[in-house]
Amino acid sequence: SLMQFETMIMKVAGRSGVWWYGSYGCYCGKGGQGQPQDASDRCCFVHDCCYGKVNGCDPKDDFYTYSSENGDVVCEEDNPCTKEICECDKAAAICFRDNMDTYQNKYWFYPTKYCKEESEPC
């Protein structure tokens, strides 16, 4: 679920996903189009693609089971569909953490009018 994703980002990256990535670049937040603007925005692009491949459950609403210790996440889900959601969220949280140094404030609340280039395929 998106609520779990927020918590996971806090545990892995040490920052709020909603605050830092809720409306960032062309892909972080609702929707997504154009080209990712930087590495952090690409994390969101890849996460959107990952969610798009999930079949049989709802990535935004369905809950999964995971554990976290010292920033390491283990998806402990028996259901293959919700485990896939957990793995998508885990990869994005790690991506945010690993690319914090490329985060640029100019892409925070980036106007969608600048996201008009043709999107690349997932």
Curated annotation (Swiss-Prot):
Main localization, broad class: secreted
Keywords: Disulfide bond, Hemostasis impairing toxin, Hydrolase, Lipid degradation, Lipid metabolism, Metal-binding, Platelet aggregation inhibiting toxin, Secreted, Toxin
GO molecular function: calcium ion binding; calcium-dependent phospholipase A2 activity; phospholipid binding; toxin activity
Active site annotation, chain numbering: 47, 89
InterPro entries in UniProt: PLipase_A2 (IPR001211), PLipase_A2_Asp_AS (IPR033112), PLipase_A2_dom (IPR016090), PLipase_A2_dom_sf (IPR036444), PLipase_A2_His_AS (IPR033113)
E.C. number(s) listed in UniProt: 3.1.1.4
SUPFAM superfamilies: Phospholipase A2, PLA2
Catalytic activity: a 1,2-diacyl-sn-glycero-3-phosphocholine + H2O = a 1-acyl-sn-glycero-3-phosphocholine + a fatty acid + H(+)
SMART domains to which the protein is assigned, alphabetical: PA2c
Keyword Transcription regulation listed: no
Record-linked CDD domains: PLA2c
Expressing tissues: Expressed by the venom gland.
Top-rank taxon, per record: Eukaryota
Family matches, as Pfam families: Phospholip_A2_1
Subcellular location: Secreted
Record keyword Lipid metabolism present: yes
Cofactor note (record): Binds 1 Ca(2+) ion.
Enzyme class: hydrolase
Biological-process GO terms, alphabetical: arachidonate secretion; lipid catabolic process; negative regulation of T cell proliferation; phospholipid metabolic process
GO cellular component, one term: extracellular region
Disulfide bonds: 26-115, 28-44, 43-95, 49-122, 50-88, 57-81, 75-86
Role: Snake venom phospholipase A2 (PLA2) that weakly inhibits ADP-induced platelet aggregation when tested on platelet rich plasma from human and rabbit blood (15-25% of inhibition at 5-10 ug of enzyme). Exhibits moderate hydrolytic activities toward L-dipalmitoyl phosphatidylcholine. PLA2 catalyzes the calcium-dependent hydrolysis of the 2-acyl groups in 3-sn-phosphoglycerides.
PANTHER family (alphabetical): PHOSPHOLIPASE A2 FAMILY MEMBER, PHOSPHOLIPASE A2, MEMBRANE ASSOCIATED
UniProt family annotation: Belongs to the phospholipase A2 family. Group II subfamily. D49 sub-subfamily.
Oligomeric form and interacting partners: Monomer.
The name this protein goes by in its record: Acidic phospholipase A2 Tpu-E6b
Protein source organism: Craspedocephalus puniceus (Flat-nosed pitviper)
